[in-house]
């Protein structure tokens, strides 16, 4: 079932999302990858204030290519999410509502999603140019020195993704593969 969500995402939106749902997001999301996550995590460990307010946000794991004329960003496909697994539970505990990436997550991340009633969405790897069309604008929020890995804010319209792990811990990476195994 395809669902349209206007961001910022609400607790009610998240509660109504089920693993396997197709979702089109419109509104504002933030971005960040490995290097930015490491810096945010280090600040959390020191008890310091983050340079960006993550409370209520969805973060997209992406490092976009340079924009072509007429586009806000270049191809903007998802980064493998496991690279942020060390950092995700701390961010969720601070109020992050969810993440957008690709691939499975470890048990600690799934537990943090359930504990915080969050969500993990996946964007389609290989569809970077299509995804870029849904990104209408961007601005750098912090860590500009990281180049493509700087934390940014994207305004998106009908950004396509799939619910991989819902707030109850239902996980397509566990439930779907057995359906396709040869018996």
Predicted regions located by residue number:
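Short, structured beta-strand/loop micro-motifs enriched in basic residues and often containing a Trp
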Residues: 1-9
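Feature captures the catalytic cores and cofactor-binding loops of soluble hydro-lyases/lyases
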Residues: 31-32, 36-159
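Active-site/ligand-binding-proximal alpha/beta "capping" segment
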Residues: 88, 164-183
């Amino acid at each position: 079932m395809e669902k349209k969500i206007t961001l910022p995402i609400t607790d009610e939106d998240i509660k109504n999302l089920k693993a396997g749902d197709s979702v089109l997001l419109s509104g504002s999301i933030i971005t960040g990858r490995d290097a930015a996550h490491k810096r945010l995590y280090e600040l959390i460990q020191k008890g310091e204030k983050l340079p960006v307010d993550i409370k209520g946000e969805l973060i997209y794991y992406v490092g976009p290519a340079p924009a072509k004329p007429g586009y806000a960003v270049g191809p903007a496909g998802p980064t493998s999410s496991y690279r942020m697994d060390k950092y995700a539970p701390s961010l969720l505990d601070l109020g992050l509502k969810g993440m957008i990436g690709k691939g499975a997550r470890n048990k600690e991340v799934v537990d943090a999603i359930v504990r915080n009633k969050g969500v993990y969405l996946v964007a389609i790897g290989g569809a970077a140019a299509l995804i870029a069309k849904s990104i209408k604008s961007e601005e750098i929020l912090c860590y500009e020195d990281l180049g493509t890995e700087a934390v940014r804010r994207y305004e998106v319209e009908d950004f396509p993704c799939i619910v991989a792990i819902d707030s109850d811990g239902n996980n397509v990476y566990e439930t779907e593969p057995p359906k396709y195994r040869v018996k």
